[in-house]
Design a protein with these regions (language model features):
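Feature for exported/extracytoplasmic and membrane-associated proteins, marking the mature portion
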Residues: 1-203
Length: 203
């Protein structure tokens, strides 16, 4: 994450441009994700890439950038955002499309609200984003549900379960109409200041 090649002597003399927030772990993480070391950017290099090639995937509701660790700079573009899932898949709106009379009433109420023609910009945007999220959940969940069981064995750690969901998502690429995908998984806990041997053994 250097701005330019830097020697210790140059650093001490202040003779070179240095990364913003040098020695800050959070800044270093952001700079790796943005590929911009001299300022704080909200757009990452996978996001910039997706802005260019996202249209190669034919489902407009599901981004080619899929995160299993929430919001991140790396997959955020100027136009494209990431689609966040969990180790269990896409999270549905509670009871939407579920069985039973209560679920049916809720589903019809939500669909009715989202189908209204809103004049206020915030209302229009919220309705469009909510409709897209619901449709994306249906598309993603159906694609995963239609897959045969994986033969690859995964352990029961949180990280391994996330990799299992990534494997399922890749296996469902034809149903999801995906030609290009990126996946973001975060594994923390590496900032060991003491008891390094003991702490690293637990990693």
């Amino acid at each position: 994450t250097l701005v330019e090649p830097t020697t210790l002597d140059q650093y001490r003399r202040g003779a070179v441009a240095l990364p913003l927030g040098l020695f800050s772990h959070s800044d270093q993480s952001m700079q790796w994700q943005s590929s911009v070391p001299d300022r704080r950017e909200a757009v990452g290099w996978a996001g910039r890439m997706a802005d260019v090639i996202q249209t190669g995937n034919c489902d407009p509701n599901i981004s080619m950038n899929i995160s299993l660790s929430g919001s991140n700079v790396w997959q955020s573009g100027k136009v494209t955002s990431h689609y966040t899932i969990t180790e269990n898949g896409s999270e549905a709106l509670w009871d939407y499309g579920g069985p039973g009379a209560n679920a049916m009433v809720r589903t019809e109420a939500v669909d009715s609200l989202l189908a209204l023609q809103y004049r206020h910009l915030f209302e229009k945007t919220f309705a469009a984003r909510m409709r897209g999220a619901i449709d994306a959940n249906v598309d993603f969940s159906n694609a995963i549900a239609a897959l045969p069981p994986l033969t690859t064995q995964f352990s029961n750690t949180s990280l391994s379960r996330k990799f299992r969901m990534i494997a399922l998502t890749i296996a469902a690429r034809q149903a999801l109409c995906m030609k290009r995908q990126t996946f973001f998984v975060e594994a923390g806990g590496w900032d060991h200041h003491d008891e390094v041997v003991l702490n690293q053994a637990a990693m």
